[in-house]
């Protein structure tokens, strides 16, 4: 009887120990599950952060592409402005050459007109001198008449030349007037071109400042991309570490669950053994 009691006490003690171990296993399993859930939550959080970083990186790359496109457009605008400036300078040069040729033609026509006027004046003075003398000598008169005829002929020729010169002068004056109009137009155009050049110069300065700012923004974007890439790699490393931790915790949970099942089976075996012992005692 004492042996049975001792056996029962031992079995009870073993049962209590099994219960304690089962409770401990259950608590450890719950703790492991909590740690696994926490690790999974951290992994999900890291995954969200990685997604956010990837989105930020995509946005930054898109902004960088837009900045590069704007910079290309500004380069094209700068090239167009330089071409316009070159064309305007060429037009100014052509206008100046045209004005210079017109001034030369005007100077030549003025000199010819002065020569014709001087010849006409000399002929007229000679005629008046011959008339005032009143020479009686017929031969002298004939000579004078011949001289007068020559003078008249010269005067007529001079008149013709004068008319021709006057006609040419009128043409030259018309050309001069048109040249002056073109010169005035050219001057006003030069003023407009100078204003356009000033505006183009300001635009060039603005483009240079914009290009410098764009370069600074590009450097900032590159630095930001570098920082985001580093953060992405760090987040991926943390995610991999968290995933390994989750796998490790899951293995620990599986081990504790297996141990719990084993303890429960052991506890059931002890209970069955106690029941059998009680049945034998009652039967005796």
From Swiss-Prot:
Q: Record keywords: Lipoprotein included?
A: no
List, alphabetically, the SUPFAM superfamilies matched.
Tropomyosin
Has the keyword Coiled coil been applied to this entry? yes
Alphabetically ordered keywords of this record: Coiled coil, Repeat
Which regions form coiled coils?
Answer: 1-284
UniProt xrefs under PROSITE patterns:
TROPOMYOSIN
Subunit composition? Answer: Homodimer.
Q: Which family does it belong to?
A: Belongs to the tropomyosin family.
Q: What is known of its domains?
A: The molecule is in a coiled coil structure that is formed by 2 polypeptide chains. The sequence exhibits a prominent seven-residues periodicity.
Q: What does this protein do?
A: Tropomyosin, in association with the troponin complex, plays a central role in the calcium dependent regulation of muscle contraction.
- Entry protein name: Tropomyosin
Q: Which organism is it from?
A: Periplaneta fuliginosa
